[in-house]
């Protein structure tokens, strides 16, 4: 907020930071739109799940969390006809990754529709390179404007198949704010992108 020049922008940033503090104290989400529950699960290769299905257990946990936490239920059954709300915001979208070790790690992303609707994907020619990725990211952020719920955290996935690139973009937003990619070259690109995204003037 110290670098924001607009008085209105400064006030909005102050209110956003107050909202962050309140959400942290009350253990509530930043935004009322808790949309689709996206769950990323790292399963250690030495972990043995007994007594039932891991996916069923996750969905029961999501349902209990959304119900007991008074979070908005947005998922409907039979979307082409009756559109009956499931009341539990399930089924969740569950991604499972096998990793070394004997631990289970679960990350929950309550992905609101406002920001999800701004997601973009593009297959580029290899010649587009780093510059092409940069242009695509900047164009996407600029065209999205104020539609995604603030604070806007941009996740970028590069490489692999179409669905894997989108998965990587979603996974990127699970990092702590300010935490960079472990690869130095990628981390430097992130810093460059962040500076250029902030220079667009989108936001307060």
Q: Locations of the language-model features?
A:
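Non-transmembrane, aqueous-exposed alpha-helical and coiled segments at domain scale
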Residues: 1-204
